[in-house]
Amino acid sequence: MTSPDSLANYYFDENEADKVIDFFSECLTHSTGQWRGKPFELLEWQIKYLRELFGWRRSDNGKRRYRQSALFISRKQGKTELAAAIALYCLHCENEPAAQCFNVAADTDQAALCFNAAKAMTENEIELSTRSEIYK
């Protein structure tokens, strides 16, 4: 019998890994700063992070291996935009009924930054905005 965290219990799905990368480049634009309105072009480290996060699947049911993630990087590296984009991907592309995504922050002002980024990305993309209802 293999342990629950044994690699025998998981597989890497190239299609799922590619799907998340394609979503970023084809469906999202930056919401703030000098890149506002421009396509979300991922940096190499972001591509690696997202492929690892979304590509690994459970052998027993095909669901993602990782349900939570913590990313620690320095200031002004695009954490907020990346978190907002990941939340939008989970909401729109994982085919989970009544999907929920949570953004955890030290205070409401900090949490609002991520919410507002996701809101702007949604409003900038016709396909996302027609599938969404934003209440705030």
Model-flagged regions — what are they?
Residues 1-136:
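Phosphate/NTP-binding elements of NTP-utilizing enzymes
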